[in-house]
Structures are given as structure tokens and as C-alpha cells.
């Protein structure tokens, strides 16, 4: 068994352990699988793994199926979804590293739709006029010319979170950032409604990792933002380490993890 195939076998075993009953092999050697999307099991994907995966080539999304009522099925353009999912696959693939788990994790963010609910308008007094009012900052981290800095704030609604984020982005230094990534978790008092989401702002998978961070920290009514100023040199996966490190520092400094 060559190294590529051995890594594929181990990856499929790991994914099957994490998501029991969601994955089946269409080819005995695992070169083609059928997998239901976690949290969205009505959608199934056929994925093929090239001979030189993961050393050189990314997996291919070859078919998307939707198992739902006929009326709802008409709402899905499976050809478009196949193209979209392949873009997600290509974005999480890095030569030499398996990527199926990261791919499935990213799909949850792509497919998630926030239920529509009536919300009370944000009171104008809740929105500061100073871009940094209400935010707690981390220390900046600089690596090979790129600088990362995080900000965390207490919020009680998505509307307040978005208003504060929009105002933060008006600062001259923030406008120069190449990416302003964000994640938030909000639980409203007296209601079972919760709001959890993220925004990569072009830095693929960064927002979902930040959301995962504040989820495992078990903090609520928080928005965390990480700005990255790009210095010209690509730093690979180290960027995610810096994003998470500054995000955690800002959240802790803001008093959420005391």
C-alpha cells in the first residue's frame, strides 16, 4: 500500500468514527465514496479521490443529491452546488494533507441558513460612535510581515454585533486590513433563540475556526474580530495559529473566560 492510499484509508476510518452512518464506499478501495453532509443529511455527495491524493491532487465532488420533498428539491440547483462544493474542496486542500474533515466542516457554514425571526430594533443608544468603544484588544502578533490583532466585545443581539463591527471597520487602520474576520455567539435573555455564525472575509476557514474556538470556550453574547494586515509573504497554516491565539487573548481579556 503506497503512502497516499494509506493516508486515504486512515482518513476515511477517522471520518467514519466521527460521523457514523454518514459515509459509505462506492468503490471497495475507497477511491469513490458517498457521504451525507453532517447537520444537513438530506444532501449527499459523491466524492472521488485521485491516485495522488493527498500528495498532489484534491478530491473531486462528482455528484450532489438532495433527498427531500419534491417541492423543496426544486429549490436546489445541484449543478451549482457541485461547482460551489468543489470550490470549497479546493480551498481547504493543501498538498500533502488530507482535507475531508475540514471540507465537511466548511460545508456546514456554507449550507447554514439562519431562521427568520422578528427582532426588536437596536436602540440608537446601544451603538457607540467611537469605532473602538466597547471593544477589548489583544496584543498584535507579527510574523513574516503579516500582523494579526483581535478585538472582542459584549453584545446582546446580532443587530448590535453587526453595528459595532461596521463601525469598527470605519477606523482608518482597520480599513487597510486585508481581512477582517469575525465570529459571534448570542443567546437572548428570556428566549430559546441563539445566534451563532462567522465571516471569513476572504480568509477561507478562518471564521469557522474562530467560531469553533468560542464554542469550546463556552462563551455567549460575544463577537470576536481578527484583523490581518498582509505583509507580502505567505505564511501557510501558521496564520490560523495566530488568528486563534489573538482571538482567544481578546476574549479572555474582555472577561468572558474568567
Swiss-Prot record:
Consequence the record notes for mutating residue 87 to A = Slightly increases interaction with GCN1 and ACT1 and does not prevent inhibition of GCN2 activity in amino acid-starved cells
Its Gene Ontology cellular component terms are: cytoplasm; nucleus
- Cross-link position, Glycyl lysine isopeptide (Lys-Gly) (interchain with G-Cter in ubiquitin)? 187
The UniProt keywords, alphabetically, are: Actin-binding, Cytoplasm, Isopeptide bond, Nucleus, Repressor, Stress response, Translation regulation, Ubl conjugation
Ranges for domain RWD come to 10-114
- Show the GO MF annotations: actin monomer binding; protein kinase inhibitor activity; ribosome binding
Q: What is its main location?
A: cytoplasm
InterPro entries reported in the protein's UniProt record? Impact, Impact_N, Impact_N_sf, Ribosomal_Su5_D2-typ_SF, RWD_dom, UBQ-conjugating_enzyme/RWD, UPF0029_Impact_CS
Q: Which SMART domains match?
A: RWD
Q: Which GO terms describe its biological process?
A: cellular response to amino acid starvation; GCN2-mediated signaling; negative regulation of kinase activity; negative regulation of protein phosphorylation; negative regulation of protein-containing complex assembly; regulation of translational initiation
- What parts of the sequence cross the membrane? none
What does the UniProt record report as the effect of altering residue 90 to A in this chain?
A: Slightly increases interaction with GCN1 and ACT1 and does not prevent inhibition of GCN2 activity in amino acid-starved cells
Query: What is its subcellular localisation?
Result: Cytoplasm; Nucleus
Q: Which Pfam families match?
A: RWD, UPF0029
Q: What does this protein do?
A: Translational regulator that ensures constant high levels of translation under amino acid starvation. Plays a role as a negative regulator of the GCN2 kinase activity; impairs GCN1-mediated GCN2 activation, and hence GCN2-mediated eIF-2-alpha phosphorylation in amino acid-starved cells and subsequent down-regulation of protein synthesis. In normal conditions, it resides in a actin complex and has no activity.
Q: What is the annotated quaternary arrangement, including any partners? A: Interacts (via N-terminus) with GCN1 (via C-terminus); this interaction reduces the GCN1-GCN20 complex formation and prevents the interaction of GCN1 with GCN2 protein kinase and GCN2 activation in amino acid-starved cells. Interacts (via C-terminus) with ACT1; this interaction occurs in a GCN1-independent manner. Interacts with RPL39; this interaction occurs in a GCN1-independent manner. Associates (via middle region) with ribosomes; this association occurs in a GCN1-independent manner and persists under amino acid starvation conditions.
Q: Into which family does the record put it?
A: Belongs to the IMPACT family.
Note in the entry: Present with 3030 molecules/cell in log phase SD medium.
- Under what name is this protein listed? Protein IMPACT homolog
Q: Origin organism of this chain? A: Saccharomyces cerevisiae (strain ATCC 204508 / S288c)
Amino acid at each position: 500500500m503506497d503512502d497516499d492510499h494509506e493516508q486515504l484509508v486512515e482518513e476515511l476510518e477517522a471520518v467514519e468514527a466521527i460521523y457514523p452512518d454518514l459515509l459509505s464506499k462506492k468503490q471497495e478501495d475507497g477511491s469513490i465514496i458517498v457521504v451525507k453532509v453532517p447537520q444537513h443529511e438530506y444532501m449527499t455527495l459523491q466524492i472521488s479521490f485521485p491516485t495522488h491524493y493527498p500528495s498532489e491532487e484534491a478530491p473531486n465532488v462528482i455528484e450532489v443529491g438532495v433527498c427531500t420533498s419534491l417541492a423543496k428539491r426544486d429549490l436546489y440547483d445541484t449543478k451549482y452546488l457541485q461547482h460551489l462544493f468543489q470550490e470549497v474542496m479546493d480551498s481547504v486542500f493543501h498538498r500533502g494533507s488530507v482535507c475531508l474533515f475540514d471540507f465537511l466542516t466548511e460545508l456546514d457554514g456554507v449550507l447554514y441558513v439562519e431562521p427568520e425571526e422578528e427582532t426588536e430594533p437596536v436602540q440608537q443608544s446601544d451603538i457607540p460612535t467611537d469605532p473602538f468603544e466597547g471593544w477589548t484588544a489583544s496584543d498584535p502578533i507579527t510574523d513574516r510581515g503579516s500582523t494579526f490583532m483581535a478585538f472582542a466585545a459584549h453584545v446582546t443581539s446580532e443587530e448590535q454585533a453587526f453595528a459595532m463591527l461596521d463601525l469598527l471597520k470605519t477606523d482608518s487602520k482597520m480599513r487597510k486590513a486585508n481581512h477582517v474576520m469575525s465570529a459571534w455567539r448570542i443567546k437572548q435573555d428570556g428566549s430559546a433563540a441563539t445566534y451563532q455564525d462567522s465571516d471569513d472575509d476572504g480568509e477561507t476557514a478562518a471564521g469557522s475556526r474562530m467560531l469553533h474556538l468560542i464554542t469550546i470556550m463556552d462563551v455567549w453574547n460575544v463577537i470576536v474580530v481578527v484583523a490581518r494586515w498582509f505583509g507580502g509573504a505567505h505564511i501557510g497554516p501558521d496564520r490560523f495559529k495566530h488568528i486563534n491565539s489573538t482571538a482567544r487573548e481578546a476574549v479572555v481579556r474582555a472577561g468572558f473566560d474568567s
